[in-house]
Amino acid sequence: MELYFFRHGIAADRADYAEDGDRPLTTKGETRTKLVAQRLQQLGLHFEGILTSPLLRARQTAEILAAAELGPHPQVFQGLAPRGSLGAFLAWLERWEAAPDAKLVLVGHQPDLGEWAEAIAFGQTGHHLNLKKAGIIGLRSGAARIQAHTDNELFLLTSPKWLLP
């Protein structure tokens, strides 16, 4: 199984919105995210599932990935909201055990995505994986089931600047 962590694109300033969850992508954020998604599609990446945080900027990012034909319509997962639960996600992930070759992408927020990737790849977190906006981390598991620090490999960590034309 391959598990990708995709941080939402550049969002509007917090000061302009009463609720953090209402902040949309900026025009620049939308444009950059579309370019990154197009590049991932050109590289032949395709996800069997797109899971997104309920916050607007993450949902918009997930929709961009789906529109670029990288995967199906996104599914909202409350556990991907800021300060979400890795345990709840791993429990949800069990439904994919029958599809060991699946590629799934999680669209969410920092520092959570970086911490989750660290916990799964290394068994601990140390705030070392800095995921830029519209950046992506890829983990591969040799096991039928992804668990924290069990035969998992970090194979991709890239900033959007390396994917933009």
From Swiss-Prot:
Transmembrane segments: none annotated. GO terms for cellular component: cytoplasm. Keywords: Hydrolase. GO terms for molecular function: protein histidine phosphatase activity. It is an enzyme of class 3 (hydrolase). This is Uncharacterized protein SYNPCC7002_A2622. One of its GO terms (biological process) is protein modification process. Gene3D superfamilies: Phosphoglycerate mutase-like. The keyword Cell inner membrane does not apply. Belongs to the SixA phosphatase family. Its EC number is 3.1.3.-. The lineage of its organism: Bacteria, Bacillati, Cyanobacteriota, Cyanophyceae, Oscillatoriophycideae.
